Amino acid sequence: MKKTYQNINFDLRQLTKPFVLGLLLCSSTTFAQTNKAVIDNIMSEGTNNSQVEKLAHELLDGIGPRLVGSPQMKQANDWAVAKYKSWGIAARNEKWGEWRGWERGISHIDMVSPWVRSLEGTQLAWSPGMGKKTSVAEVIILPDLADSIAFQKWLPTAKGKFVMISMAQPTGRPDYNWQEFALKESFEKMKAQRTAQTAAWRNRIAKTGFNARTLPVALENAGAVGIITNNWSAGFGVSKIFSAYTKKVPTVDIALEDYGLLYRLAESGKKPSISMHTESKELGAVPTFNTIAEIKGTEKPDEYVMLSAHFDSWDGGTGATDNGTGTITMMEAMRLLKKYYPNPKRTILVGHWGSEEQGLNGSRAFVEDHPEIVKNLQALFNQDNGTGRVVNLAGQGFANSKDYLGRWLAAVPDTLKNRIKLDFPGKPGAGGSDFASFVAAGAPGFSLSSLSWSYGSYTWHTNRDTYDKVVFDDVKSNAMLAAIMAYMASEDPEKSSTVKAEGVKWPVQNKATRRGGLDN
């Protein structure tokens, strides 16, 4: 008879209940030699002498965003290596591929007719630069035409124009604002209109015979001087900033308020004109790196505990909560471990991954390049979903994860764990962040999942993902939690089990893209 595994969900706020306490402490006797002083010292240092604010300032303000292939990404790699070495921790940059090098310059966009207004906007990543040229031209809206034949006939009209290719949002107020103040019938009416408008705009794009990726190229080939978009992030003042698809002319995102202004003026026949000047540099193929730091194990140096956080970011903001906070969490955790646990039983590594944003490429490459580490991984702890306290930890489909994670959590002070919800054995993550690269290879990688702090709308990939959004008390707590979990995993006399739960579909291990943005 095959053994089956029941999925166990519980909340660590229930730790006073005997049956849950027993679950977490069932194997704690194996830690008779665990040094409580190490945990006490980590808590004291992490609370009273934390370096997270200093690290955040140096990374987010001093270096800024870390787009893969940009000079700032390499600057951040080198900064992290130097910082680790200043703490007495061995560190290195490991090359795993190459990417299209690009350096962002300035973006100046102004409406000059029918009246003058400086507009809030920025070029998208990898947008072609304009050199020293400034373009002044009329703004037009992508028309709603019958079909692709009609669109081809219209295309010459785009010559010499800026073309708006995004839907104008019916409201700049996020839904939570409507829920708080609007009449219910007004809110429902707005949502229905927005749904219909979104479907109609999607159909408008489809009827051109192109899609969101190919339409900008068709327009630039027809002579458009620039492409204007708005990728609203459903909050006040936020846009998501991703990649340009044009090869010759700039693509910019203009904030909802200004995009709506231009759209309404164009729609009503006022023929608005804007002046645009954007600069950027193409740098050719540049090497891409993961930054790896290491505290060598003494008893089992060929077994590994890993901390994990992607280092790259989109560049509309400064990559503060995606994933500057994960980065400084793991750097601070390593600092704490080096200071109070300098001779771990197992080797403790940290991986700061490149090109997570384009598909977990840095961590996938590491998994491919280091099978000996993947095979002998005791546990990996990853943090990548914002600045909030860790509130969720799942077993990622490993049948016995509740046993060893339970043992390690038992030593974590209640102030750090009393709001964490556990899900055992859970389901294996197929993507989303770098722990999934290890899980797909059958290695025990776990996500330290955080409170939202409106992450999805206000900071995730947005122009407002900046230092001021970091909640440092929560980051400090996460750094101490990560350090203690790494300590306990290193000390555990037992090797963690990688037996997969029955009936769980395991994700496919995907290969890293090692040459990006250069072949299209």
Go through each PLM region and give its residues.
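Bacterial N-terminal signal peptides
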Residues: K17-S28
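Noncatalytic luminal/extracellular "stalk/propeptide" segments of secretory-pathway proteins
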Residues: N35-A37, H57, D61-T195
